[in-house]
From Swiss-Prot:
HAMAP family per record: Ribosomal_bS20
Protein name as it appears in the record: Small ribosomal subunit protein bS20
SUPFAM superfamilies linked: Ribosomal protein S20
Family: Belongs to the bacterial ribosomal protein bS20 family.
UniProt keyword annotations, A-Z: Ribonucleoprotein, Ribosomal protein, RNA-binding, rRNA-binding
Region (Disordered) location: 1-25
Function: Binds directly to 16S ribosomal RNA.
Gene3D superfamilies: Ribosomal protein S20
Keyword Coiled coil in record: no
A single BP term in Gene Ontology: translation
Disulfide bridges in this chain: none
Phylogenetic classification of the source organism: Bacteria, Bacillati, Mycoplasmatota, Mycoplasmoidales, Mycoplasmoidaceae
GO cellular component, one term: small ribosomal subunit
Length: 84
């Protein structure tokens, strides 16, 4: 643990941000998994929203967000064709 007050504050802040980012990533992974096996357009729109929000907050890189949206849409489309 840090001996300097400012370092202690930085440590507390880092831990808080880490927990928040972990929660955002968990939500992202969950919604992507549900969307890939879903056949509802609203679910895909919600996934896009969560992916964009996560990228804008800096949790994931914007290129990763675009790649994730593309792959999710492809899996969604494949699942839609199989169930139809």
């Amino acid at each position: 643990m840090a001996n300097i007050v400012s370092n202690e504050k930085t440590y507390r802040h880092t831990q808080k941000v880490r927990k928040e980012n972990h929660a955002k990533m968990s939500k992202l992974r969950t919604i992507v998994k549900k969307t890939r096996s879903s056949n509802e357009q609203a679910q895909l729109n919600e996934a896009y929203k969560v992916i964009d929000t996560t990228a804008s907050k800096g949790v994931i890189h914007k290129n990763k967000a675009n790649r994730l949206k593309s792959r999710t849409a492809k899996a969604f489309k494949t699942n839609l064709e199989v169930t139809a």
